[in-house]
Amino acid sequence: MKIPISIAIITKNEEKNIEDALESVKDFEEIVVVDAFSEDRTVEICKNYTDKIYKLEWKGFATQKQFAVEKTTLPWVFILDADERVTEALKMEITEKISNDDFDGYFIPRKNFFLGKWIKHSGWWPDYTLRLFRKDKGKMQIREVHEKVIVNGKVGYVKEPILHYTYQTFED
């Protein structure tokens, strides 16, 4: 049985990352990708996981993500970046969370990795971000930097983290 959540992902030239991200969410009911006209194999890879791929010229992180959210069709949306992964433990926890009606959104900790090493200090852990929310209660705050989801309702916290693989090399 598929997890009844829509995944919303934005991409631009993410062929190095996107397959691992999509593989980690392949058992979600819906995956929506909004691509900013990638010039690599990103879209080709995405086609192996979803047919819900939309093109939108780059307009900033918040605008791209809001467009992706608007294309989803399920009551719950999870925004995932191309360099992030959802673990089995996180899938189990969020499946349980959405089965009750206590909250309209959830902050999820991010476990950030730099050059393959987990960054535990300097404010990089637990790095809570609001990524899971009821579509009818949340939207992106449109601003230049540090975009975030705004939820009109109660928000809770999840214990299991998203794995975030930032820079794998100094060239990245």
Where do the model's predicted regions map?
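Conserved beta-strand segments of alpha/beta enzyme cores
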Residues: 30, 52, 154-156
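Acidic helix N-cap motif at the loop->helix transition within catalytic regions
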Residues: 17-19, 40-49, 89-90
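N-proximal low-complexity "stem/linker" segments adjacent to membrane-targeting elements
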Residues: 1-24
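Active-site acidic short loop of glycosyltransferases
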Residues: 2, 27, 51, 72-75, ...
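Catalytic-site signature of metal-activated, phosphate-bearing donor transferases
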Residues: 66-69, 76, 80, 87-172
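A conserved acidic beta->alpha catalytic loop
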Residues: 24, 35-44, 81
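Conserved donor nucleotide-binding strand/loop of the catalytic core
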Residues: 43-71
